Amino acid sequence: MEEIPAQEAAGSPRVQFQSLETQSECLSPEPQFVQDTDMEQGLTGDGETREENKLLIPKQKISEEVHSYKVRVGRLKHDITQVPETREVYKSEDRLERLQEILRKFLYLEREFRQITISKETFTSEKNNECHEPEKSFSLDSTIDADQRVLRIQNTDDNDKYDMSFNQNSASGKHEHLNLTEDFQSSECKESLMDLSHLNKWESIPNTEKSYKCDVCGKIFHQSSALTRHQRIHTREKPYKCKECEKSFSQSSSLSRHKRIHTREKPYKCEASDKSCEASDKSCSPSSGIIQHKKIHTRAKSYKCSSCERVFSRSVHLTQHQKIHKEMPCKCTVCGSDFCHTSYLLEHQRVHHEEKAYEYDEYGLAYIKQQGIHFREKPYTCSECGKDFRLNSHLIQHQRIHTGEKAHECNECGKAFSQTSCLIQHHKMHRKEKSYECNEYEGSFSHSSDLILQQEVLTRQKAFDCDVWEKNSSQRAHLVQHQSIHTKENS
């Protein structure tokens, strides 16, 4: 990079500008200014170059950085749109934290890029902007965005330095995103970002180069709170504790999400359709669930059945529907009608008889009696997974799998269980109770399975006796192997 002499011909003052491409003289009425907030003022009055200004960024280097930046932004957009909207993915806090850190890096890269590149269309001259006059004054256009723009102008003919700074306007506190924000304004991408519930935090990232580095793995964060959360991975610290079940978590958000298991709270409610959502009080626990539910209202039905021209929004629903036209494994023995599901067949068979549809046995179980064949019904259905049960108590016990409820608590150690049988079995450990005794030898067991296993061992023992020696074997193969010793001796 060539240095411009500080003095030209006498009587023709020049103004020195720091440019991204090169340090050039302003000889045109429309100069191009480029910001570099990290640089000090360029040249002293006698033309000597300061040490800080020797490292100017070449144009080729900037082009490479811009290209790399665009490629990375494209990859990030692709990764975010490809995130599966299932509960299992969003429960993985490690993947969520990695995705957040990726986006923070790109926002930081965008901010750095904007600090060193300012288009000349951003500036407009209100006063004299020609270069042949010693006193120069420039101003910014009223449409300039909120970032701070600093322009330093030096008069090389005089030792007086004109340091003209153009600061940010009243809206400067708000961090704006140029290309990145516009790219993510599409409904599909923005929905994925908002689903992560951290878009507002990313927009409020301060315009600073301060960073926090992890001493263990070297990972860099832009906020001290993010570093503190990350360090809990190495220390395995879990400061947030649930008062209900005493389970600990490393993040407060995880504890809040866990508390919904005890309170059965479902805060995400669909407002798109009163008929299918609010009328039935349709709500979902994780944010991914409500997004998946909202797609019922917005998704186009693009899967069409070739036989009956019925349209479905999901391919699995179409596949299940096509079984009606192809596979009919359930057949009515009265009229010969075919059905694809057993439930449809049972519903149909009620038409053929005028008798009482339900009969009850001594246990209170309901049956459908038709031509001597008993079809046991399961009238209790789980609203979460659709599984059917014959007794209401079985349904209540099954629903604890979804809610995570452990209603049966041990009085001695405080451990909780979802089933009464598990609690009773646990109590035997404290009492050291062994209620299952063996009749053949003096011994008792706390579990019936242990007793059965011991009895099987005793029945196998001494089942195979040797005729020569008084030796017993529990397996025939051992006896045959032993008897081969006698056959060799006799031979």
From Swiss-Prot:
Q: What is the stated purpose of this protein?
A: Probable transcription factor.
For the cross-link Glycyl lysine isopeptide (Lys-Gly) (interchain with G-Cter in SUMO2), the position is: K77, K190, K201
Question: Which parts of the sequence are annotated with region: Disordered?
Answer: 1-52
Family designation: Belongs to the krueppel C2H2-type zinc-finger protein family.
- Consequence when changing F106G: Abolished interaction with INTS13 component of the integrator complex
**Transcription keyword on record:** yes
Where are the coiled-coil regions? none
Report quaternary structure and partners: Interacts with VAV1 and CDK4. Interacts with INTS13; promoting association with the integrator complex.
Q: Where is the composition biased (Polar residues)?
A: 15-26
Q: Does the keyword Nucleus apply?
A: yes
Consequence the record notes for mutating Y108A: Does not affect interaction with INTS13 component of the integrator complex
What name goes with this protein? Zinc finger protein 655
**Gene Ontology terms: biological process:** negative regulation of G1/S transition of mitotic cell cycle; regulation of transcription by RNA polymerase II
Which PANTHER family did the record assign? IP01015P-RELATED
- An example Gene Ontology CC term for this record: nucleus
Instruction: Give the UniProt keywords, A-Z.
Output: DNA-binding, Isopeptide bond, Metal-binding, Nucleus, Phosphoprotein, Repeat, Transcription, Transcription regulation, Ubl conjugation, Zinc, Zinc-finger
**ZnF C2H2-type span:** 212-234, 240-262, 303-325, 330-353, 380-402, 408-430
Q: Name one GO molecular function term.
A: DNA-binding transcription factor activity, RNA polymerase II-specific
